[in-house]
Amino acid sequence: MGSGYAKKKKEAKLMERQFMEMEASLEQKRFSGEAGNGLVSVTINGKCNLVDVKIKPDCLDPEDPEVVADLFRAAFKAAKAALDSEMSAMHMGMPF
């Protein structure tokens, strides 16, 4: 086990550190999505945790409460797509 092993071990530690830094950076970022022309907006962080939800009163219909749920799901899906896009771009720069 010569210098090749030591070099690989050093590279692995560097990649691990870069990955942890990337993960910490991603957690601090915010990703937003909206639906219904902005009637519902959702913000998540890089760990996909819900940070904020905004619902405009215009979409609150007591006769059809499912509308809000549908808009929420669509807004969350848009925010998650933004997060996935960012993660994909970050992984493109990783050597593995």
UniProtKB/Swiss-Prot annotation:
Gene3D superfamilies assigned to the protein according to its UniProt record, in alphabetical order: Nucleoid-associated protein YbaB-like domain
InterPro entries found in the cross-reference section: YbaB-like_sf (IPR036894), YbaB/EbfC (IPR004401)
Superkingdom to which the source organism belongs: Bacteria
SUPFAM superfamilies per the UniProt record, alphabetical: YbaB-like
The entry's keywords: Cytoplasm, DNA-binding
Keyword Cytoplasm: yes
Major location category of this protein: cytoplasm
Annotated coiled-coil segments of the chain: none
A Pfam family assignment: YbaB_DNA_bd
Compartments, as annotated in UniProt: Cytoplasm, Nucleoid
GO molecular-function term, one example from the UniProt record: DNA binding
Sequence similarity: Belongs to the YbaB/EbfC family.
Oligomer status and interactors: Homodimer.
Function: Binds to DNA and alters its conformation. May be involved in regulation of gene expression, nucleoid organization and DNA protection.
The protein's name: Nucleoid-associated protein TC_0612
